[in-house]
């Protein structure tokens, strides 16, 4: 990797390399046994370490979201190596609430990135306030743009996780939309009579990010291309229930 690239670019390249070498084609199933070997994560660990002196506020306005997504996803990949096959990723001590990453001299937990920065310091599911207190200097790193589709870009290394992606310089909106559509294609189910729509659990956790249940339904239906399915739902004249899938935290380890 060229040393002329900035730390954000090197992080992207290292994360993309790990995905290509140690994940299946879907980007969801990882070989965490191989990733425990130092030689297989040397580039990624070095790219993450280099962020300690990097200020992402120097990036163009459209790039900080991609930077924080890559930082989050890289941190999860490295942390998930501590999880044994068949065990829940959520059982890793302090996975989400302990600082695991240093950027511009500040320590960040995964919750700080997801909820503090990418969601505008909104509360995590089950909490009453955002993770970063008022006046916290880390709030200065909040991206100036907001996009609720970041929910589909965050990797959690488990069976219910979205795919691992490295977000690059291409238009971020296109990359986020691809992540959403991949999720809808894989996880959304519609009843034969259109009476219910099954959606990922994240919609139950963060309905306000999508405008409540009516907004969730609109968000999902806008990404279903099957006219017959849409006609079944339209025939219900709004009498459609949302069902939320269970979330499986088990490590998605390659066999």
Language-model region placement:
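Interaction/scaffold regions that mediate signaling and macromolecular assembly across diverse proteins
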Residues: 2-255
């Amino acid at each position: 990797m060229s040393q002329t690239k900035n730390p954000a670019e090197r992080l992207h390249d290292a994360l993309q390399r790990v995905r290509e070498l140690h994940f299946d084609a879907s980007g969801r199933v990882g070989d965490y046994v191989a990733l425990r070997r130092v030689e297989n994560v040397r580039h990624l660990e070095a790219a993450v370490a280099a962020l300690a002196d990097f200020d992402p506020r120097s990036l163009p306005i459209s790039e900080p979201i991609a930077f924080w997504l890559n930082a989050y996803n890289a941190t999860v990949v490295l942390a998930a190596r501590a999880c044994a096959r068949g065990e829940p990723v959520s059982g890793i001590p302090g996975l989400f609430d302990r600082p695991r990453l240093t950027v511009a001299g500040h320590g960040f937990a995964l919750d700080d990135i997801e909820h503090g920065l990418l969601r505008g310091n909104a509360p995590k599911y089950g909490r009453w306030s955002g993770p970063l207190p008022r006046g916290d200097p880390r709030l200065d790193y909040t991206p100036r743009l907001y996009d609720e589709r970041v929910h589909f870009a965050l990797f959690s290394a488990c069976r219910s996780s979205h795919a691992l992606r490295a977000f690059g310089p291409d238009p971020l909106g296109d990359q986020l939309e691809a992540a959403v559509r991949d999720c809808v294609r894989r996880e959304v189910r519609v009843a034969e009579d259109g009476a219910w729509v099954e959606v990922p659990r994240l919609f139950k956790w963060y309905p306000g990010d999508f405008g409540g249940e009516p907004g969730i339904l609109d968000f999902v239906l806008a990404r279903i291309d099957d006219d017959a399915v849409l006609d079944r739902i339209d025939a219900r004249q709004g009498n459609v229930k949302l069902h939320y899938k269970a979330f499986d935290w088990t490590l998605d380890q390659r066999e």
